[in-house]
């Protein structure tokens, strides 16, 4: 059989997916986090891998799914939260635009799996399956009640799950995880299709969503999940020391308010008294595409007048950020390589060839 006859769609997918293979898995495993620091990697959407100086590994909102893949059904799912929000009927054209940079089935060293809320792009059955199959049998799954309900429904033993609500603290080796109030109003209208939201007082946010503060020996990270802007960020900033804050940013389509704007991101950072603010979530959905440079431009306009005590950082999916080593950087660039140029003799026809 010739090569072109032996290749199938399935063999093509297996040979190219996930796009980064186990490259990032290996990088994270090999990373030695220096004392007085923490390292984290952006996994796409609001997915984060955090590693402490003690070698503790936790992942938050790691999602391995996709968005729309076909024009087959031109209508939005009845009762979808975006339909409730804006009274729309047409299919939302939210295609995933970010590659898969971490292979869940290549994860071996992990100390906790966390989710901020139960929306499909923040909690993943494949991650749960991979951790259950390949990692230690005592790795906890930590999240609000709705997330735990999902994990248990997928087959994660109930005793492996920890339900958290605002005010709860969970210790995972040298990382202290504080569950804080979430401000994700979209979560409150994510309801069964036959349930009406109009004229009904929503149930509590605390069972649906939480924000997290990760206190490590080398610094503190605030993860806001899908939270919108809230005045309560200032309360969190009053009560906790926050070094780096992550906020869900995006260009909201007409009639929709689901992501923070550039102004919201700056207000969040100011309220939290953070040192660095990093936007995320803008990478993932084609119809929420946004330019994070807008945040930096607005920051430049306001920073001297308002005396901002923070800086924005523009990240790339799969990239690493180390606190405090990267605190004065404004943008991430992937490693460029070729740092060992001319360690061996070039093989060129003549010296001035290039």
From Swiss-Prot:
Q: What class of enzyme is it?
A: hydrolase
Q: Which InterPro entries match?
A: L-ascorbate_6P_UlaG, Metallo-B-lactamas, RibonucZ/Hydroxyglut_hydro, UlaG-like_MBL-fold, UPF0173_UPF0282_UlaG_hydrolase
| Chemical reaction(s) catalysed | L-ascorbate 6-phosphate + H2O = 3-dehydro-L-gulonate 6-phosphate
Q: Which domain of life is it from?
A: Bacteria
- Provide any one GO MF term from the record: manganese ion binding
Return one Gene Ontology term, BP aspect. Answer: L-ascorbic acid catabolic process
Q: Which residues cross the membrane?
A: none
Pfam hit, one? Lactamase_B_2
The record's EC number reads 3.1.1.-
Provide the alphabetized UniProt keywords: Cytoplasm, Hydrolase
Induction (free text): Induced by L-ascorbate. Repressed by UlaR.
Cofactor(s) needed by this chain: a divalent metal cation
Compartments in which it is found: Cytoplasm
Q: Does the keyword S-adenosyl-L-methionine apply?
A: no
Q: In which pathway does it act?
A: Cofactor degradation; L-ascorbate degradation; D-xylulose 5-phosphate from L-ascorbate: step 1/4
* Free-text function comment from the UniProt entry: Probably catalyzes the hydrolysis of L-ascorbate-6-P into 3-keto-L-gulonate-6-P. Is essential for L-ascorbate utilization under anaerobic conditions.
Q: Which HAMAP family match?
A: UlaG
- Record's family? Belongs to the UlaG family.
Which protein are we looking at? Answer: Probable L-ascorbate-6-phosphate lactonase UlaG
Q: Specify the species.
A: Salmonella heidelberg (strain SL476)
This protein's gene is called ulaG
């Amino acid at each position: 059989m010739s090569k072109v006859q032996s290749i199938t769609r399935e063999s093509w997918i297996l040979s190219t997916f996930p796009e980064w293979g186990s490259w990032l898995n290996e990088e994270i495993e090999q990373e030695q986090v220096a004392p007085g620091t923490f390292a984290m990697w952006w996994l796409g959407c609001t997915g984060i891998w955090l590693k402490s100086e003690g070698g503790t590994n936790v992942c938050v909102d790691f999602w391995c799914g996709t968005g729309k893949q076909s024009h087959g059904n031109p209508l939005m799912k009845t009762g979808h939260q975006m339909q409730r929000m804006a009274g729309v009927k047409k299919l939302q054209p939210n295609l995933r635009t970010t590659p898969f940079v971490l292979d869940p089935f290549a994860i071996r060293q992990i100390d906790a799996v966390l989710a901020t809320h139960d929306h499909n792009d923040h909690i993943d059955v494949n991650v749960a399956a991979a951790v259950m199959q390949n990692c230690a049998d005592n790795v906890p799954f930590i999240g609000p009640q709705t997330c735990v309900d999902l994990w248990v429904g997928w087959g994660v033993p109930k005793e492996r799950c920890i339900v958290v609500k605002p005010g709860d603290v969970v210790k995972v080796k040298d990382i202290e995880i504080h569950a804080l109030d979430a401000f994700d109003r979209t979560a409150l209208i994510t309801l069964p299709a036959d349930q009406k939201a109009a004229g009904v007082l929503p149930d509590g946010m605390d069972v649906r969503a939480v924000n997290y503060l990760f206190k490590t020996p080398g610094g503190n990270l605030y993860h806001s999940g899908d939270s919108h802007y809230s005045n309560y960020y200032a309360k969190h900033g009053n009560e906790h020391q926050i070094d780096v804050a992550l906020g869900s940013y995006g260009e909201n389509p007409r009639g929709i308010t689901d992501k923070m704007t550039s102004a919201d991101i700056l207000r969040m950072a100011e309220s939290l008294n953070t040192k660095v603010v990093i936007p995320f979530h803008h990478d993932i959905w084609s119809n929420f595409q946004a330019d994070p440079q807008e945040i930096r431009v607005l920051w430049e306009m306001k920073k001297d007048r308002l005396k901002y005590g923070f800086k924005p950082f523009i990240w790339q999916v799969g990239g690493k950020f180390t606190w405090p080593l990267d605190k004065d950087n404004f943008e991430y660039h992937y490693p460029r390589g070729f740092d060992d140029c001319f360690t061996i003799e070039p093989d060129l026809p003549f010296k001035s060839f290039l």
